[in-house]
Structure formats: structure tokens, C-alpha cells
Curated annotation (Swiss-Prot):
Belongs to the AB hydrolase superfamily. Lipase family. Ubiquitous. Highly expressed in leaves. InterPro entries: AB_hydrolase_fold, Fungal_lipase-type. The active site is at S303 (acyl-ester intermediate), D366 (charge relay system), H422 (charge relay system). The gene is DALL4. Its EC number is 3.1.1.-. Keywords: Chloroplast, Hydrolase, Lipid degradation, Lipid metabolism, Plastid, Transit peptide. This is Phospholipase A1-Igamma1, chloroplastic. Disruption phenotype: No visible phenotype under standard growth phenotype. Decreased dinor-12-oxo-phytodienoic acid (dnOPDA) formation. Induction: Not induced by wounding. Induced by wounding. It comes from Arabidopsis thaliana (Mouse-ear cress).
Amino acid sequence: MATIPSHNLRPHTTNQRTQYSLSFRPHFSRSTLITFPARSSPARAMSRTDEEASISTRLEQESYGLTTAEDIRRRDGEAKESKRLRDTWRKIQGEDDWAGLMDPMDPVLRSELIRYGEMAQACYDAFDFDPFSRYCGSCRFTRRHLFDSLGIIDSGYEVARYLYATSNINLPNFFSKSRWSKVWSKNANWMGYVAVSDDNEATRCRLGRRDIAIAWRGTVTRLEWIADLKDFLKPVSGNGFRCPDPAVKAESGFLDLYTDKDTSCNFSKFSAREQVLTEVKRLVERYGDEEGEELSITVTGHSLGGALAVLSAYDVAEMGVNRTRKGKVIPVTAFTYGGPRVGNIRFKERIEKLGVKVLRVVNEHDVVAKSPGLFLNERAPQALMKLAGGLPWCYSHVGEMLPLDHQKSPFLKPTVDLSTAHNLEALLHLLDGYHGKGQRFVLSSGRDPALVNKASDFLKDHFMVPPYWRQDANKGMVRNTDGRWIQPDRIRADDQHAPDIHQLLTQLHHPSQLL
């Protein structure tokens, strides 16, 4: 077993405390303020206080008047009260392909898109990117304490398992590796998690069902990984998918990342695909046929994580993992943010036939959402697509798209920087202010715009929010008893897979052997 650090250890020299707005729960008024140590709450930025107005309040006063902003928030709040998530969750999950929900923007859908986007953002906030850390490439927190360590309280979800992938594939700009010789794993990276909504009555009342959520890590702003893609489609049926059509193809790099494994590594001796399918199967068997229990499967991810979200959502449906023992079909939805194209037109058609719903949130200026397949894609003339459909570089987006434009936000610089336009926190900010085509940009939930600069330099300078401000105190270094600065040890990572994983895999590939 490897050792993974616990970030409950705090520097002896630091006694700073910061106020954070902490919850996955959607809100439309001033957020509840809870005091947490700044070191243990990297996922959230400072919220509004009575003593000092936030930058969002100041901008509202400067731009369009606080009364207008408060009126819009009040209107959204009233609309949300009249149409609660528990009563409309199937439509929010795409039952009708989100018809009539995006223009004007439905406040419940907006709230859910932000909530699932924050689940994807948690993968960034918890990931150890530091090459000078011997734990680089791992999650900084144990799964039982993931949300608490990020300062996210009342999430309503419990992390069921962590996901790992082997780095022995040709995506060098995606994986992070330590410069230390003795590391937690030489060939694995943490990729995300599978979570399930808890038994709390408030959670069940709010969601209206039990939700299995899969969150994939992507890339914060670096776009070099796009150049690593082979831009070559290959049949999914050759990678263990139970697909009857050999013409259904996906980008080979995404397939490799999802299906490859390294039997010499405890963390990735099972592929990310096998880890996801077996855990979802376990949860479906546990909850799927409970009387009065409704279930949903929601997959989320940003950037390359968005590609994995689409691929795994398709896989869950293709393999029939979303069917209970009694034959009930569980809806599968993917919410992606700045995700690239994944497969060809036959892949798109197959996803639609399986009933998988995909909603893609994109910044119109984001190049990743236009890749791969820059020239041969769903926007090409239909006649050309029919002729070129069999070519290994002819791609098609799937599902529905919600296009946003960062130049509409009065908070953000009108930059043309490609990596900045790809930022997930910026997308969540744009979601918060979007009310429909041609409508004024007004923040609806009070989500703090300072979060945008957590890992970017996107906010206008006069708001005085430093760029790239999110970091651990003293970059994670602490003083030991001798007064020397060291990296603290972390709690051991759980590199043991479930004891019944082989049995579950057998059942997946040979359904007749179901017990």
C-alpha cells in the first residue's frame, strides 16, 4: 500500500481563518456562512458578508443596478419554488431533451448544472498537481472525507469509490507525475469518483430520487493534451463494449484512457472502465429494486473528463448496467462542460437509440469543444458527411448544447486566450448569469465570481482578485518537531478493490451467470 497525505494536518505557523460558502445545495439568497480553516477548504471562495460587499454586489451596483439584480433573483427563486426538483427531476435529467428549459433558462436546470459542475470541479480541487510532491497524481483526501475536506457540507452524497487510470498511454500532457523517486504509484493517476446520494430525508426530499453520480477529472486550463490525441477513430466493440454495430467508433485516445490497465499496479490493475461499471452495478443492485425507490445515473466531467463522461454514460447503457434485476430501466444522463467530440455519427446515433441523454455546456470561444474533427463534423453538409462517414477522422457531437459567451459577462476580461476560455469555474460563472439568448447577464444565485480566478487570470483587474489564488498555506509544507519544513505524510490510500469485483465483471460479460 502507498501512503497518501491527510490534509487535516495544518502548518504550525498558520492561524488564518476564512469564511466560505459551502454546499452542493442550490441557493438563491445570501449564502450561509460557516467558518473553516482556509487550508481545509480550497473548493470555495469567500462569500458575501454584512461588513463588506462582494465584488458581485459592487458590480451589480455599477453595471445594472442592485434592484434589477435582486428582482431577477427573486423571480428565479419564485419560479424554483413553484417547480421543485423533486417533482421535475426527469425533465431536468433530459427526459424531453431539455425542450423549453434553456431559452429562457429554467432556474432549476441552471441550479443542477452548477451543482454537477461543482462535482467535476471537486476533482480539480482535490487533485495533487505538484510535481515536487511525492503524492503527485493522487487525490489529496480520503474518499470518506473528500467533500468535508473541500469545505463542502451538506452535499447529500457519499463517495462510494475512487477511480484510477494507468498513465502508460500516449497522453503525456494529461497525467501528472512526481519528481520523487519513491512515489505512491509510478503508473497511476486519480481520475475521479463514484458517489451516491445518501439516506438523509432532506436529500431524498430535495432530489426526488436516489442519484448515482460519476465525476471525471479533466484538465484545468492546459490544452497541450489535445495535440496528444491521435485523432483516429476505432470501433468500440474491439474494447470490450457489447456493441452490435462495428461501425460505432470513438477516438482512440479516449478509449485507451478508459479501457487500459496495468496489472503490475494495485491502483490500475483494473481499468477505469471496469472500476466504473462494477461500482455502478453494485449500487444498482443495492438500490434499484427497493420499493418506492427511484434511481438516476448522472455522469459529469470537464474537458477530457467530459469525453470520459460521455463514453462511460454510453457504456453503462450499452452494457445494461442501468437495468435492475426486475428489468426497470434507470435513466442515464451526462452533463459535460467544455467537452470535446468523442465519436462518429454512428456513435451519436447509438447513444440516442440507447436513450442516454447528454447536455453539453460550452463557451463559444473554447477550442476544445470544437475538437477533434475540426473540418469533418456534424456541421458539415449532410451529403459530405454521408460520403466521409467511414473515414477515421470524421466526428460528431452528441446530445444537446448550451452555448455561453464569456464576453457577455461584465465580470470577465474580453480575452481571446484559448486556455482561459476553457476554464470550468468560468463556465459555472457564466451559467449563473445566463437567462436566455439576448437577455442581460445577471448572477442568479450569488455564486462568488472570485472563484473564476482560482486557477486563471480571467476577472477584470479592478475587482482586485489575485489570479491563480487557490493554493495551500506554505504550499503544503509543515514544521516538524525539530522545526524543519517537511511534507507531511498522508493517510494510506485504499488501493484494495472490492473483493467481489471479479464476480461482478463475470456477470457483466456473461449476464446469464447473474445470481
